From Swiss-Prot:
HAMAP family: Glycerol_kin (MF_00186). Pathway: Polyol metabolism; glycerol degradation via glycerol kinase pathway; sn-glycerol 3-phosphate from glycerol: step 1/1. ATP binds at T12, T13, S14, T259, G301, Q305, G400. The gene is glpK. GO terms for biological process: glycerol catabolic process; glycerol metabolic process; glycerol-3-phosphate metabolic process. This is Glycerol kinase.
Amino acid sequence: MEGYILSLDEGTTSARAIVFDREGNIKGIGQYEFPQYYPKPGWVEHNPMEIWDAQVRAIKTAIQKAKVEPAQIKAIGITNQRETTIVWDKNGNPLYNAIVWQCRRTAEMVEEIKREYGDLIKEKTGLIPDAYFSASKIRWLLDNVPRLREKAERGEVLFGTVDSFLIYKLTGEHVTDYSNASRTMLFNIKKLDWDEELLEIFKIPEGILPEVRESSEIYGYTRILGNEIPVSGDAGDQQAALFGQAGFETGMVKATYGTGNFILVNTGKTVRYSENLLTTIAWGLDGKVTYALEGSIFITGAAVQWLRDGIKIIKHASETEDLAEKLESNEGVYFVPAFVGLGAPYWDQFARGLIIGITRGTGREHLARATLEAIAYLTRDVIEEMEKLVGIKELRVDGGATANDFLMQFQADILNRRVVRPVVKETTALGAAYLAGLAVDYWESLEEIESLWRVEKIFEPRMDEETREKLYRGWKEAVKRAMGWAKVISS
């Protein structure tokens, strides 16, 4: 009987389940959305039980659509939105809503801690202190949910990121993997353990934390489909995408084009620090840890959504490609989509969106082109930062916006690097499936996985150097003018 791997891909707005075969082909997908809650400005929450219910429905739909028997599922892998923080009791019941990675409620707390301990935190965790990561969210819960700290001291509270919660609901085991642990701002990425000094700074009892394991091993067994199935793969979404892109060698880099862009480069067994990028754990496998540098760009695909829903100059995201191609060049129009500040490598929370260079002749095609170009410029900003530490030959891409050929060609041109789009676009779920399959010998080795990675299209750079650098200089100038704007208007 043919065997398959089930991958659970738990995102920020939906829970998905995908069944993969031995060649990495998709046999069936289930996907269900769940709501986000905004109790106060800047606060973002999920109901963990709504995530769980959506995930269970997605699993059942994927199995049904794949037309496979539960007994044919050889292992389950999990990948997840990272940093989102959940606390629950030993019966698996949540004790508060999940505090989502986007939530800014702890920004002031983190600013205070950063002033005193910023360098220490970066040295130990690889992260630039921010409300984005789990540590301050856990502290907020312990300080604000009635009796939670008291219960935690009695050993009645469990914390985890979403992967950890799902593994607990599936198997009863309280574990996470290295990649997810490295996003909590509590995990020492050199010692590979929870850091006592950081736990003290954030006033978090160690007893609530999950055991940290490799990204590919059997964590426990589940009977979600009736029969016993090992849960044996776990990685945060961006790390899973790098694994799914077979980015196993030092210097291999992937960019995921979603609401924002996330760019990860494999730095091998070495912990490398960059002033403007995050250092993170890519995965733990066969007793070895692989590290990565990460650049997070907050707004990319969301800028295209704004063209559609905000100023309503397009009906569908795909229209931007045709509009952009109506022009020979950007005609001096730049758009810096700093709607929520700028992420890597600028880290300016006071930057705001800017459109510059418009004239009476500027039309919607200019705005569409400037938006797509901005995504490519922002990606180059991060890759230039990475290249200071590690050589990069090509960019492997995934995510919704990679279907846009204009964007992919412009990306290759502005980077002066080959851009490679794979056949299977679901690289995040595929990465989790590979990790799960390796643990149960469904796949034998990284070499076998590498041989399954297939190219759909390669975009070679075609732009001359003078044009490329002139365009990029214009971009850098536009960014300068967008930076700090929120401070200017509030002073």
